[in-house]
């Protein structure tokens, strides 16, 4: 089971996930949305497409752009559609 934890709070947990370039992507339904707020940050990957970000909020602390997703991934990255990945201090274990 994969798990994402930040500031002592489980943000996502799932037995099913996708691993791309060493990052674990959690299915949307496994993510605790109450800890996420949309960010205006975007980035672009030549083979995955345009990423969007979430800022994570736990116990009054924020972790800007700590989660990302591809709302409309390119065909080669179709497996990560409806999935979210983490970085910036979020501990992810497979």
Language-model features, listed with the residues they occupy:
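Terminal leader/tail segments of proteins
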Residues: 1-94
């Amino acid at each position: 089971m994969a798990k994402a934890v930040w500031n002592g709070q489980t943000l996502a947990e799932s037995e099913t996930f996708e691993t791309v370039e060493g990052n674990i992507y959690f299915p949307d339904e496994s993510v605790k949305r109450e800890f996420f707020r949309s960010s205006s940050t975007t980035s672009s990957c030549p083979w995955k497409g345009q990423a969007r970000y979430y800022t994570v909020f736990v116990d009054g602390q924020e972790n800007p752009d700590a989660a990302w997703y591809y709302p409309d991934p390119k065909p080669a990255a179709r497996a990560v559609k409806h999935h979210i990945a983490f970085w910036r201090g979020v501990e992810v274990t497979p």
